[in-house]
């Protein structure tokens, strides 16, 4: 990689800068053009980069105002075996919106390994205003990325050659990917429906049996009046049965409660009789004891009398 005609402008002393600013006010707009040519050959691995920078005789022309807008113009020439016609893009400074023009994009043909290729890029920077700030522009070297191109089995047909269209950008350069005109349509896929859904879509047929005139079923005659009376009778019977069962339950419960009370009275009476019998037994025991005492006393008395008489 080699650089040609490269000039770097450095700042001068204070006395020369005053003269430069005075002369620059009376001079027209300046133009700086940078031309970069790149040659690529697949057979050789050498890549040569030649840069040419054309600068006016006056060094003060390189001073660009910081607040002044820049107009950048980039022109790209296609490679010999590649026919490109990119659509020009216009970027508005105020709205910053891209407006692509309607130009067809030609397909890219594959590169052969033996044929050389060349590409040239030209960049033009134009200053439209002047400000006191000093900005020095120096060329910079940027590496070039080489991407291999995969050859397809069937090369696309090459359309007729057309002249390159310029791309005008303001403030910044945007790269848009190329889109091929030939787009493969999607392969239609067969739609499969399950057997259950197919069966559900078919109308269901109910098997019916044909009857002759003699075998026809008799039609039911609606008895609305009799049915209503039967319903009323059933309802009344249910109500009466419920009331009777409730009354019987209440009466049985009342009788049982009365019998319980009577039994409690009888039990109390029996308890009182038992108590009286116990008292009677005690009285009888006391009487027996008294009788025995009287007997002993009488025997003692008779014995004493007999002894006295003897």
From Swiss-Prot:
Listed Low complexity bias regions: 94-126, 164-184, 192-208
Please verify whether the record's keywords include Coiled coil.
yes
Residue ranges of region Disordered? 1-53, 78-127, 153-217
* Ranges of Acidic residues composition bias in the record: 11-25
Any single Gene Ontology cellular-component annotation = BLOC-1 complex
Coiled-coil portions: 268-299
- Composition bias (Polar residues) maps to 37-49, 78-88
**Top-level taxon:** Eukaryota
Q: Which UniProt keywords apply?
A: Coiled coil
Segments crossing the lipid bilayer: none
**What PANTHER family does the database record attribute to this sequence?**
BIOGENESIS OF LYSOSOME-RELATED ORGANELLES COMPLEX 1 SUBUNIT 3
What's the name of the protein? Uncharacterized protein DDB_G0292106
